[in-house]
């Protein structure tokens, strides 16, 4: 395939184009103008670049990865406020882009993304239903409020009881008896990997990772991983290794937070 980097000039406010513009970044994998076109969203920056996503591979399709407005390079030189960072404005961005791509590609248009990318694909379809033929949204967690109280009873209802008990037991162990050891191990890992923790300090990052452990386990691992939960008597290194696999402390590192 051929690979292109593309910048689309977009209004900051589609209802008031006189308020200025920004350049929205996208990357194109071009195979064939008659093949399907996949519009791929992350909901954040463009970290796919030239990597073909699952839907693209399945359909041997063209692919356009669209960076979300106001993330990474796709932002105005100066942002007076964030009022135009809305799902409707983003959907309008994607409508502009889809309209352009329809002039170039004759095949079916598919739209996809995971997590906030899945949500983004749904929002585009909600405002501009005729832009794509198919929407394949992976993991689109549309919350109703902050906080959304539906999550807690849902978590209570999934997974074997003994598995949940062991998972919660090591959370308690980590925060009551292993906190200092985990912070030491996380600090060593940060030094080795060149990570900094200035927006959220390291002790808070460790605590956040432990608190998020149950959520992350059921989101990314599932019941098949129950046998791999270490005992409360496991070594500090074993507990830290498990934490890093399931709910990484580095999620709160400066470089990672900058992406979101």
List the predicted regions and their residue ranges:
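Conserved alpha/beta-hydrolase
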Residues: 56-76
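Glycine-rich nucleophile elbow surrounding the catalytic serine of serine-hydrolase chemistry
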Residues: 113-123
């Amino acid at each position: 395939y051929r690979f292109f980097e593309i910048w689309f000039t977009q209004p900051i406010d589609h209802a008031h184009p006189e308020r200025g513009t920004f350049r929205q970044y996208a990357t194109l994998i071009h195979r064939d103008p008659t093949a399907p076109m996949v519009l791929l969203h992350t909901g954040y920056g463009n970290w796919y670049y030239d990597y073909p996503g699952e839907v693209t591979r399945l359909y041997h399709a063209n692919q356009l990865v669209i960076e979300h407005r106001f993330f990474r390079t796709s932002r105005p030189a100066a942002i007076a406020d964030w009022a135009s960072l809305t799902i409707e404005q983003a959907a309008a961005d994607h409508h502009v882009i889809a309209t352009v791509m329809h002039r170039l590609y004759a095949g079916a248009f598919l739209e996809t993304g995971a997590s906030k990318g899945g949500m983004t694909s749904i929002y585009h379809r909600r405002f501009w239903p005729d832009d794509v033929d198919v929407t394949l949204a992976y993991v689109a967690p549309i919350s109703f409020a902050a906080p959304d109280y539906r999550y807690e009873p849902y978590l209570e209802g999934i997974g074997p009881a003994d598995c949940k008990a062991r998972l919660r037991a090591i959370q308690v162990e980590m925060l009551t008896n292993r906190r200092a050891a985990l912070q030491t191990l996380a600090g060593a890992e940060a030094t080795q990997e060149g990570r900094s923790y200035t927006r959220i300090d390291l002790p808070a990052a460790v605590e956040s990772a432990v608190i998020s452990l149950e959520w992350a386990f059921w989101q990314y691992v599932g019941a098949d991983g129950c046998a791999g939960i270490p005992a409360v008597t496991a070594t500090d290194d074993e507990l830290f290794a498990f934490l890093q696999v399931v709910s990484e402390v580095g999620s709160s590192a400066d470089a990672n937070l900058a992406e979101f």
